[in-house]
């Protein structure tokens, strides 16, 4: 009974915490040979959207640290709201944003950067598989944590339920160990990595701060029998990792 009460309380805390975040993340992936310039130009475009569209969604950039990709990303409460916003933006706002952008950067701003669209991605937030320590204000913490480690997980056929149950157990174990960090779990709706069933987004104030924190967490975990039992019976395989920096 005590475990049921604790689990219910944790679920309520999770729902309240993640109610602050939109449910869907839509990300357009671009590759470029001049990441610094392309990022600057995309940031100009982002800022103009936020400045000129009073209904603009949460909009940010993710820049790959060890590669040449930039992700132009927005978050929406539903796919219907995305479709409504996108239609209104293209019909009524985009021409004004484009005119201002060209005024700032010229007609052929991306010339020489070899910037090419790769594909669009749609992800759904999974609050039940995410972790934000109790008492932490997520919206206040997000701008402080500019580093993102994205881990794509492949789950075998018929093992989704087992993976999700394992993820929940690992979160509860970290709570027991007083490991405090932020992990957001996303589930691909469209796009994503081939064979990727989930994407874990683990936050840090910087890459160095993230790995220092991870080292401390692993010391506690490796001394804990429950954690070691889960470690020795993994569900799912990490198939891709990216280190990115976020720009709001």
In which residue ranges do the predicted regions lie?
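Positively charged n-region of N-terminal signal peptides that target proteins for export
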Residues: 1-4
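Sec-dependent N-terminal signal peptides
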Residues: 6-11
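Short S/T/G/P-rich N-terminal loop/turn motif that feeds into the first structured element of a domain
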Residues: 19-248
